[in-house]
């Protein structure tokens, strides 16, 4: 059977869906990946996928470009003739579903997170909801990554209750992200891993760090992730450089493997505004690291306050700084317990096999009996 997997970047497929893709290939599925070409496309092809390039601007909303995207996806779908199409991220979910409906190809969508668009009551939010409502009536199944997003879509009647299901994000590979022996750093180390955009709480993190330093708190404050100044909520390069030059944070750049950086930190921080299920927190918890995250949808399902980490208030740098102080004051035994609890939570609730099995069951249910 031919399966199409559609995302906004090849990088996303390789980093978050590759074990699922390999599983499909092992089972004999013909897997077609559809995403813009990038540095990871050849890795998909080397794994056995048949790749199709698509022009997709994931950054903005341009009606003309988005209309062209529907047409382009329609042409690809008509050529490939997949039995089922799996969409991830906003534009494939919306425009890909519309294109597939014209060809009557069954679609499975994955709402990876709503970002901040649904937090506002403006024209953009209204248009986004209308697009979801129009497109999602054609989806056979819609997976959500946290119950808050699922309930929001049901309350606003954007999706049929019969079509929805819940999965723990993309899951986590428990064999890849494993704990190391506990060893507290001589200088307590906080690490935030994220693209450098405001929605991830970067500005609150920096403000909290500045507050802690002004109080004489002796710790290391690190930042790992790509600069993205072209993003509409990206932080300007010169601003980031000023943080580096002033010694506010240690900027670690980017990496293709975060495991070493997670392992050398004492605590992982993510004061994000809203998430689906943040991969960074799954990786941290699976590695038995204590976490500080915002008490918002997505984050507060991965982090249980005072069980495997601490929750701080949204957009509140003072509260974040207070939680960071509390974390640093914990004894080795308390830090170890938080980390171990996080690992147990991942094993029980977030093993990627849970996600893979739900998708396989859905594919089975949607496959016509021969």
PLM feature spans:
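Donor nucleotide-sugar binding/catalytic pocket of nucleotide-sugar-dependent glycosyltransferases
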Residues: 52, 133, 137-179
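Aromatic "clamp/platform" in nucleotide-sugar-dependent glycosyltransferases that forms part
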Residues: 254, 273
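Short, structured helix-loop element that forms part of the nucleotide-activated donor/catalytic region
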Residues: 41-45, 215, 220-248, 252
